[in-house]
Amino acid sequence: MFGNFFLRSMSRQILIVPDKFKGTLTAAEAAEAIASGWAAAWPGDELEQLPMSDGGDGFGEVMAASLGIGERLFPGADAAGREREIPCWLNAECNQAVVETAQSNGLALLPSGRFHPFELDTFGVGQLLIQLGQAGVKTCIAGIGGSATNDAGFGMARALGWRFFDEDGQEIQQWIQLDKLA
């Protein structure tokens, strides 16, 4: 009896920290919806919203909002090698970028039924990192969730200029051949 009285008569500080609700709400939209419902039920409470990310889809937007930085588009390739514009978030003051690799090699970017893991790679992520370096970026904060790839960064390393060879000195062209790495 007294517990409910004190809960309703005292103002509380509430921190709302959601991730996205995949396919329905971004983390920011989820935080706003939760805050709206909470405020309707307990109008005296002090609410603070802090949308979060697990490093996958939505990571860039959450970090950009937190850091107060702007978006810039870069040409690049998705996990299947198709060209697209890839958003990154840049802080020119400290030569820093926020990279959401799901925007380059994300599972959500693939058409339905197109998930063939042996044909997908992170080459586009490497291309993006090269462009960021050319733009003066010195530090990257990367979210690497939501990926359609499992190439252990092989494609990214190749885009950055690394070469891999088998015991016969033949260059390895696909990550699935890494078991032959010398």
Model-inferred region functions:
Residues 1-9:
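N-terminal amphipathic/basic-hydrophobic helices that include classical n-h-c signal peptides
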Residues 10-15:
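Extreme N-terminal starter segment of soluble prokaryotic enzymes
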Residues 16, 48-51, 99-101, 140-142, ...:
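General beta-strand structural signal in soluble alpha/beta enzymes
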Residues 20-24, 28, 53-55, 144-152:
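Gly/Ser/Thr-rich loops at beta-strand to alpha-helix junctions
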Residues 28, 32-51, 58-59, 133, ...:
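Alpha/propeptide regions of enzymes that mature by internal proteolysis
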Residues 36-111:
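Glycine-rich nucleotide/cofactor/substrate-binding loop typically near the N-terminus or early
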Residues 45, 51, 96-99, 111, ...:
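PLP-dependent amino-acid enzyme catalytic core
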Residues 120-123, 127-143, 148-182:
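Glycine/threonine-rich beta-strand-loop-alpha-helix active-site module
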